[in-house]
Amino acid sequence: IMKLDLYTERLHLRPLTEDDLDLALEMFTDERVMRYGGGASTPAEIKAQMPLVTRRSDGGCIGVWCVIDRTTQEKIGSAALTPMPIEENDTNWDLLLNDCIPLAEIEIGYFYKTSVWGKGIATEAASRLLQFAFEDSPLDVVVACFEPENHASKNVLKKIGLRYESTRFAYGEIDAVYAITKQQWLDQQESG
């Protein structure tokens, strides 16, 4: 069985469930959190999305995790490995069906409460998720895309080893796309 509970020094990542609506409402109604994530949503929209965003595929490897502070047990954010949309404005959750690997490129993504910004949390969680992707899942490549002015996200991706690949269409707009292969990741682990 795939072990989907992931731990770091400060964090516990576990699969997002519908019981995490409280976290979703706090983050996704916040314009600051959603500045580069398509803008804030209404509580009704978020509630309607919960059954979709809690889907997983490929035996659980692909999906969204809830990020929890191990000291306080507070839910502080979400991190995900999900199919990257090209034409659509949002993830196509219909691609997440448990027994298959989505054919789309798999991207790493994350959202955090503003209260934990600037503490290295996003980097710590993303680094662990990348390790999971290449050690425990069948993925050979992980990509990420972001609006070019989202410097904080770019810095996280560079810290965990992703490199600029191209500027191209994703989420229905022109985004910068970063990528890392399993071999590149393994080489980085060896070089420390």
Residue ranges of model-derived segments:
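Conserved GNAT-fold acetyl-CoA-binding loop/helix
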Residues: 32-53, 63-65
